[in-house]
């Protein structure tokens, strides 16, 4: 099923996606991490993590694969301004839309990671709005249930969580614990 991969990285080029990625890690960690098996869920926020973690993904051990979430349409528009004297060396981007620049970064990183041997799955939704997030929740919950059953675990229980909660409640003196 996982072809020797033990880590799935969920990546997105949208900072506002951070908390959705945290939800995704909880969903997959609680649902699949059982009986000594399961793929470790991790997340990266590109482009912020590209220079640090991008190096690891590109040239590190080949025990991971990447799922990249993309929003095809931006909710806002921002054109890169022209800087007098080109102080940051970015005038070649002047007038270009930030969403288009991020899309180009996504495509360039995907090509590099694939050529470097990192399997890459793309998940695309129209916009980062309520409907887009609802599509992602439905997709990931269904995918998680299917992959859990295919791995031979019940994706709907959490015995590991119950074990630490039981210990914590007892240590804190919760009545009946």
Predicted regions span which residues?
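A SIS-like phosphosugar-recognition module
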Residues: 1-177
